[in-house]
Amino acid sequence: MLKLLLGDPNARKLKKYQPYITEINLLEEDIKVLSDEDLKGKTAEFKQRLAKGETLDDILPEAFAVVREAGRRVLGLRHFDVQMLGGVILHSGQIAEMKTGEGKTLVATLPSYLNALTGKGVHVITVNDYLARRDAEWMGQVHRFLGLSVGLIQSSMTPSERQKNYECDITYVTNSEVGFDYLRDNMATSMADVVQRPFNYCVIDEVDSILVDEARTPLIISGQVERPTEKYVQAAEIALTLQKDEHYDVDEKARNVLLTDEGFAQAEELLGVTDLFDPEDPWAHFVFNAIKAKELFLKDVNYIVRNGEVVIVDEFTGRVLPGRRWSDGLHQAIEAKEHVDIQPETQTLATITYQNLFLLYPKLGGMTGTAKTEEAEFERIYKLEVTIIPTNRIRRREDLSDLVFKKEIGKWQAIARECAEMHELGRPVLVGTTSVEKSEYLSQLLREQGIPHELLNARPENVEREAEIVAQAGRRGAVTIATNMAGRGTDIILGGNSEYMARLKLREYFMPRIVRPDDEDVFGVQRAAGLPTGHGAGQGFVPGKKVKTWKASPEIFPTQLSKEAEQLLKEAVDFAVREYGDRSLPELEAEDKVAVAAEKAPTDDSVIQKLRDAYNRIKHEYEEFTSTEHDEVVGRGGLHVIGTERHESRRIDNQLRGRAGRQGDPGSTRFFLSLEDNLLRIFGGDRVAGLMEAFNVEDDMPIESGMLTRSLEGAQRKVETYYYDIRKQVFEYDEVMNNQRRAIYAERRRVLEGQDLKEQVIKYAEKTMDEIVDYYINVDLPSEEWELDKLVDKVKEFVYLLSDMQANQLEDMGVSEIKAFLHEQVRIAYDLKEAQIDQIQPGLMRQAERFFILQRIDTLWREHLQQMDALRESVGLRGYGQKDPLIEYKSEGYELFLDMMVNIRRDVVYSLFMFQPQPQPVVQTSSEMV
């Protein structure tokens, strides 16, 4: 009703930006006639206009028109009006909700080009290394054509490579890399080690995934601490002995476990201790983690075991997260449960949440297919508005009603039947599952029925082929099982993706002959021992060694290449080998060559031209098959998407649905659910249990009931609220840490950049003297009762150079005079100390100042992080005492922070006065001065 009275706020917003689009379209004809050189020249012209005082908004229409034309010339893609609209919204610091297949990647080129003109740098943030690389290679061509530099950050890069890439006008990087680089920069010991520039503007692709789904997980850089590994093993054995409901309760909702009195008694008896919480020999932490590992962390759901290591599986994307570990000893507990080597436990050195990381950008925009459901959260936490961009073509997707089964087994059998029917009809099917285990169970069912299918989950052998599998998921009768949103970012094109197939064929011939051998195992694939090496991948084979093969599965290709096309391809590769050298390029550079060859960008490189001719010929041959198949699949109803469980957020369900019906194609979606699914079991409560009893139906008969659907939606809303509250709590607590983090990092950066830190150290010393005076002198007592002896002793403790000072020198002075006298003495002592040190090596004192300040900041900040963690644990319990834990955390956290700052000052003063370097001819780096 309100909408009718006030009008749709989204429509009002779109209307506000419409004049920009009209102006861009009017400029199109003028821009079209420019030569390539003139089009490139526009970049310098825009920079001059900005230097003369024009704003980015002033040049927006012309800049966007230039990017549109560059996109048409380089990629053969012209931005639609709705994509232009998306670009304007991103530039204005909002979230653009754009449906799958509407070309979000292309939209990002508009605001990133415009904002890069200021020279302050733009980050385009994606969810994984593969997408960052793909976008930098693909969309980066538009920017490179227009004269801007494009950087790419990959997890395997060295600090100097990172520095170079962050210096570029536009840098493509994943959310985790940008976060870890930020933390590492704030642990650097010299400015030369800092890799990032100050943040300016970023565009986040899949913004919901990064700012909502990952917001509960902080980024942590940690160092190792020694803990006895046998405790983990013993605790794992205890956990196996203890029984659920008798010895402990499991709270699946809060993902926590609580020991009962019987449980405590049993555990203490088995361990032969009297108290699990004994500070001298603590066991509680180990036992709780072991039970969590047993009950809440399941193999092939939350993690997989690979090469004797426990590797986390991302619950939202189904991808593995190598290198990431659960903290607080939980990862070690799981390692003990799985009987693999237990890695040392870690201590947090630096941490930040994605929420606070991205709030460091003065301006940010984001794109996703699904943001409206989380609009309130985006506005409250990030002050980001969500604007829905209309689709370019009318949507023809049909969302069928849910089918609910009583038992899980009935649901899976029905899904297998539906896959078989669709396969028979020649319609492609995409099945989204929530875990590796479930995807493999369905795969087993389909195998039994003899239905050919592709499996895409976190198992390493499948991850390698991710883009390849998704690119062919639209072929006639294809059945693809994928965990969650694996394959996000790769479009499912009906009839198959001829461009991608041609690119695979090009890689197959080109890569083995051009990639440097030592580069091969960077992204290596484990091959079975004894197999011959793949196509051209060097002679001989070392069993168990990782060897890279670029050979795609033969069934991917719709047809054999003609003799002429194959000849053309071989000649192009031979020519490349002659020009570049045999197996001479790093893998990333070779990938880049393939990417450029597969696009339309003008090039002077004769190798690229030859490779491009071969690529175009192959694509043309494949297209004859895929275009016929496309029409056939469209005629049969397009892609059918099956959801196998409702997720904890409607948004993730919508992402899965969004794979079907892209760009006006037909398609359909249906969710198959059972009353045993986690969502209904954990959050549906007694109501669902009652319904289970009431429905006296067969296990494989679907139930359709309005009451059930309402229960389901209610459960989903409950989960969304529950997780939103957790994220809000994480944010509020981290907000306290954030203010402290910013203060300490700003202080640290001042020290790193500061040329002369002498004044700062003297201020530290004066402040320390003031604190000593205030501690030993009680102004309410007569001066003869002041503890001047103790005061002087304490001063000498800090500054041994003042050993001649006597208490009687201070007897006739007031408090402010004593302070002024000590300030003067400290200055003299510091000059003396500096002269002593600089005799050993000129300028050594300056290095020592920087070294000691940074060292004390880092050590005490590390200890402070642990104190804050402990404080957070303890204030949680005060909630029972009618106190607000957050207020307690803020006030006590502030006290701890002030104590830390005082200790930094005192430690630096003490360390510098006590510093006695050994005379030596040369001191190479400040870190050798210990």
Curated annotation (Swiss-Prot):
GO terms for cellular component: cell envelope Sec protein transport complex; cytosol; plasma membrane-derived thylakoid membrane. It is found in: Cell inner membrane; Cellular thylakoid membrane; Cytoplasm. Keywords: ATP-binding, Cell inner membrane, Cell membrane, Cytoplasm, Membrane, Nucleotide-binding, Protein transport, Thylakoid, Translocase, Translocation, Transport. It catalyses: ATP + H2O + cellular proteinSide 1 = ADP + phosphate + cellular proteinSide 2. It comes from the Bacteria. SMART domains: SecA_DEAD (SM00957), SecA_PP_bind (SM00958). It is an enzyme of class 7 (translocase). ATP binds at Q83, G101, E102, G103, K104, T105, D491. GO terms for biological process: intracellular protein transmembrane transport; protein import; protein targeting; protein transport by the Sec complex. Its EC number is 7.4.2.8. Monomer and homodimer. Part of the essential Sec protein translocation apparatus which comprises SecA, SecYEG and auxiliary proteins SecDF. Other proteins may also be involved. This is Protein translocase subunit SecA. It comes from Nostoc sp. (strain PCC 7120 / SAG 25.82 / UTEX 2576).
